[in-house]
Structure formats: structure tokens, C-alpha cells
């Protein structure tokens, strides 16, 4: 089975988010974690999502990794390229979303592409080209305080244009999207006739995403958040195997929960876990830097906690003021690296001790943990929350993982994940 759709995602949780949407829409989907090596076999699936860690990478590195991933997918038979970024368009005015999209356009021969990070189920909508997080414009939402990609402008055309060297970015508004796929295609043609090659597309609900999916049929390249994953599988109607696309093997056992995200959503989830009596140990990056806290010590605590509880959470999660204080002391890059390295080492110790269920919060943390565990392929299972599925390694002695973007999930996400674990 050769993939019909090949996706290049700029972080690990974003990749699982998209894979979740594709599986929900009926495509048998496999996640390929990390930059692929040329010559590696492309997994047999209807959709393959290559999960990179390029969201905050320098432009040349992000472009190179993304092109390598797409070439690998294309050589494996993928017919359409889907460049997946965050539903909050995480980047900076000098970020890499525009350059990666431009490079993929050239590689795929696309003369036009769309940008639609909307994910209405998670409160991310676009109106008149402005991105909203629930009722708040992006620049008024907690994303304005993101430690790596503070989002200070909700106008996606204005945010994207500098990344494209000042190229004009068009808009296909909700009034057009409401009219369906034919109207969207006509708007695309009108923009192309004016020499405009890039356009933001409004989306306020799943019907809009499905219409955009139909309008995107046959396009060499689309760029979007995960939401468009609901609309695209239908364009391959008649070519899909059908049946359940999200079945996983039974795994069982206790779960280790690791949280490196400092988003407002994850802070609330950690607080709720603690309030509900969940086993919790807060990791202090300063203590790790000073040698007063170690991965070995953290795992010792977790292993003891898991003797009496179905799940134990180690969290480096802190509110924005505390994050800034740590970054001022250690530097932003060192602080992030300490968290990722320490939680990854704890995960390695847990796996060696027989733990086969992991729940991880934070895109960078998820990437670090899966890399440390040597996991390169994941089958996609049932949804825990919008954008977050359970996944499992392929082969004997499977390990189950839930990889959560920091911003996703209800306050009870950790409890919900634990209760639904395979």
C-alpha cells in the first residue's frame, strides 16, 4: 500500500494531531517520527505523517529537513503534500512557515497554495484573515506569552508576508467559503490571475474545512493546521480501504505522565490532576541545573508512586512569570534543553523498568521523549481529546503514547487519557 497523502509536520504533537484527524476521517495513518533517512522504506498506509522538530529551527535547517521529508514521502508514492504547522501559527516575523511553504511549492511544482491553521473543535478559527483562540484575537490570547514564539499579531496575511520576502498574501473570506468548494476554487483562480500565489482561507467551522478540502483536491501542496485533515480524506473517496482506521493492540499497565509544556491549558491540567489527588512531582529546572535534582531521583519517586497508583505525573509546568525567571537565570535554550533532557532520561528509565504507557504534554518534550526511546513509527489510534489520539509502536512488545500539544485538552485531560489508555 502506497500513501495517497504525505504530510510534513513541524513538531511531534502537531503530527499526532493531524494523524488523529486523518484517522478519524477514515485514512489508515502512520506517524514517522524524526527526519527520515533516504532509503528508509515508507510505511504502508493511506497517509503518512513525517513528524519533524523544525518549528523553531533556523530557516535553512527547517527548509532542508522539510524538503528531505517530502522527497522521502514522494519517492514512496505520496501524491499530495500537506505542510502542517500549529493551529496558532506559532512562528515569528522571521519564522520558517513561509520559507518552508515556498520551498515545498517549488519542489512540488505548485503555482498556488493556501494557509489555514484553523481548528474549530479546539477554538481556533479564522475570520477576515485574523486568527482567534476561542473569543480572543491571537495576540490577546495566552499565546502572546509563548516562550519561543510569542504571537503578537492576529492578522495572518501581515504575519506571513515578511516570511515570504514581502510577497502579497491574498484572502479567501468566509463569505466565499460559505458558498462551497466551487466558489473557493474560483477565488483561487482569481488570485492566481492577479499573480498572487499565497492565500489565507477563513474557516469558522468543520463545514468550512470540508469545503476547503474538496477545493484542494489535486493541488500539489496544501498548508494548514490539523483541521484540514477532516476535509482532505474525502477527496480520495473510492481509494480508501474502509473499516476502522484507529484500532490499537491492548497494552495495559501503569502510565508515566511527563509534562514539559508551560501553556495556560497545561498549567490548568496539572493543577486539576493535583486537586483530584493524582500523584504529582514538580520538577524544578534550577534544581536540575544545580545538581540538586536528577533524572534518577525523579524516576525513583515515580516508580514508588506507580506501585500504588495507575499513573504518576512529573511536571516542569510553570506559569509565565516563573518561566521567565528560569529563562533569565539559565537562558531560554538551556532551560528548555534541561527540561527535555531530564524528562527524556526519566522516560528511558521507565521503559527499561517495563512501563509501556506514556502520556506526554508539550510538543518539544514529546519530540525529545520519543527520540530518547528510539521510537520511529507509530500507528494512530482513537482520540482522547480533539487533536490528541492514543498511538502505539508497531511490532512486538508495543508501547502506547499520548503526545499532547501544550494548548490542547480539557482540564481533565490527564485523567481522560489514563482512563482511555489501550
Model-derived segments and spans:
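C-terminal structural cap/anchor segments
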Residues: 302-305, 309-361
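Conserved, well-ordered active-site substructure
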Residues: 355-356, 364-413
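Glycine-rich, highly charged phosphate/nucleotide-binding loops
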Residues: 35-38, 58-72, 342
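N-terminal basic/disordered segments at the start of proteins
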Residues: 1-43, 64-66, 118-121
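Cap/lid and interdomain-hinge subdomains that line or gate substrate/regulatory clefts
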Residues: 2-4, 46, 59-62, 70-209, ...
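Conserved, well-structured core segments that form the ligand-binding/active-site neighborhood
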Residues: 134-301
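Short acidic, glycine/serine/threonine-rich loops at helix termini
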Residues: 18-20, 93-97, 124-132, 183, ...
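A structural-propensity feature for long, helix-poor, extended segments
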Residues: 46-54, 308-310, 392-422
Amino acid at each position: 500500500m502506497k500513501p495517497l497523502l504525505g504530510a510534513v509536520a513541524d513538531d511531534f504533537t502537531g503530527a499526532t494531531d493531524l494523524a488523529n484527524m486523518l484517522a478519524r476521517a477514515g485514512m489508515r495513518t502512520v506517524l514517522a517520527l524524526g527526519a527520515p533517512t533516504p532509503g528508509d522504506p515508507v510505511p504502508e498506509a493511506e497517509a503518512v505523517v513525517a513528524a519533524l522538530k523544525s518549528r523553531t529551527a533556523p530557516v535553512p535547517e527547517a527548509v532542508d529537513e522539510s524538503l528531505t521529508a517530502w522527497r522521502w514521502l514522494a519517492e514512496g508514492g505520496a501524491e499530495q503534500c500537506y505542510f502542517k504547522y500549529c493551529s496558532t501559527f506559532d512562528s515569528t516575523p522571521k519564522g520558517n512557515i513561509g520559507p518552508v511553504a515556498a520551498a515545498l511549492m517549488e519542489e512540488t511544482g505548485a503555482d498556488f497554495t493556501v494557509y489555514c491553521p484553523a481548528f474549530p473543535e479546539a477554538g481556533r478559527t479564522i475570520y477576515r484573515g485574523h486568527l482567534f483562540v476561542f473569543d480572543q484575537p491571537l495576540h490577546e490570547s495566552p499565546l502572546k506569552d509563548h516562550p519561543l514564539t510569542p504571537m503578537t499579531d492576529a492578522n495572518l496575511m501581515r504575519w506571513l508576508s515578511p516570511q515570504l520576502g514581502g510577497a502579497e498574501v491574498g484572502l479567501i473570506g468566509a463569505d466565499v467559503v460559505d458558498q462551497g468548494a466551487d466558489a473557493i476554487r474560483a477565488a483561487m483562480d482569481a488570485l492566481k490571475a492577479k499573480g498572487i500565489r499565497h492565500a489565507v482561507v477563513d474557516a469558522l467551522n468543520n463545514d468550512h474545512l470540508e469545503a476547503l478540502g474538496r477545493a484542494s483536491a489535486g493541488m500539489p501542496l496544501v498548508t494548514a493546521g490539523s483541521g484540514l485533515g477532516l476535509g482532505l480524506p474525502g477527496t480520495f473517496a473510492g481509494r480508501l480501504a474502509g473499516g476502522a482506521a484507529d484500532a490499537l493492540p491492548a497494552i495495559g499497565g501503569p502510565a508515566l505522565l511527563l509534562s514539559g509544556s508551560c501553556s495556560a491549558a497545561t498549567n490548568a491540567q496539572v493543577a486539576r490532576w493535583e486537586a483530584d489527588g493524582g500523584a504529582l512531582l514538580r520538577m524544578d529546572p534550577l534544581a536540575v541545573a544545580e545538581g540538586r535534582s536528577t533524572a534518577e531521583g525523579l524516576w525513583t519517586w515515580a516508580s514508588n508512586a506507580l506501585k500504588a497508583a495507575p499513573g504518576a505525573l512529573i511536571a516542569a509546568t510553570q506559569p509565565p512569570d516563573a518561566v521567565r525567571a528560569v529563562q533569565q537565570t539559565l537562558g531560554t535554550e538551556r532551560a528548555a534543553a534541561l527540561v527535555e533532557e531530564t524528562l527524556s532520561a526519566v522516560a528511558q528509565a521507565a521503559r527499561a523498568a517495563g512501563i509501556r504507557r506514556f502520556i506526554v504534554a508539550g510538543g518539544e518534550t514529546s519530540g525529545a521523549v520519543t527520540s530518547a526511546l528510539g521510537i520511529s513509527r507509530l500507528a494512530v489510534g482513537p482520540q482522547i481529546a480533539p487533536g490528541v489520539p492514543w498511538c502505539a509502536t508497531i511490532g512486538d512488545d508495543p508501547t502506547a503514547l499520548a503526545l499532547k500539544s501544550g494548548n490542547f485538552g480539557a482540564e481533565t485531560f490527564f485523567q481522560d487519557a489514563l482512563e482511555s489508555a489501550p
